Amino acid sequence: QELQLSSVGSKQLIRATEDKKEKRRHILIYNFKVYLVMAFCVAVVSLYSSLTGKDNSVVGVTVLLAVLVLRQADFGIRTTHGLGSILGIFTILMTGPRISNLVSPVPAFFINVICILLLMILGCHNVIMYNHSTFVLGYLLLQGYDVTGKMYVRRVEGLLVGMILCMIIFYKNQKNRPYRRTFLDLFREFDVHSARNRWYIRLALIASSA
């Protein structure tokens, strides 16, 4: 059961334990979990690299980050509608970076702004979860390590597999959350005058101009 605790939960347990022997045991279990996660990360990226090619190792990183986030995070909307958000996010990751690399810098800037802004709206309505950093980072990595031809087809295939995996994990862990907001509420509640949405726009502009 202790292995199933989150990082925060493990640290709280260690701090709350007064018996030195028990504290050492909790620390050893926590360190074991850290090494286990590292081994899992290396295995996932290596598997993706072997299946989709070395040029697509970044796909493994992107999917891995998404899986680690969606194990615990949510989108602040109904779980079934959250699956739609995941579909939208991965569709952007499959197409946005490729399209922006096909055009000149000025059109590419506007494409990136739109894509990153959509990633923020779809993936970061619940700001506390910090989902935005994962998906925006994945977008920038895929854009920076662009591929064409057969390698791009493999990239899309790898992202499709990752999307399905994320959907399964997300639904399994979040299906009992009682959210009333729907997918469309993500767009209905968009207001350029709100602090959250101004932050969305600033981040999209900054990331696109980098």
Q: Which role fits each region the language model picked out?
A:
Residues 1-210:
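Alpha-helical transmembrane segments and their membrane-interface boundaries
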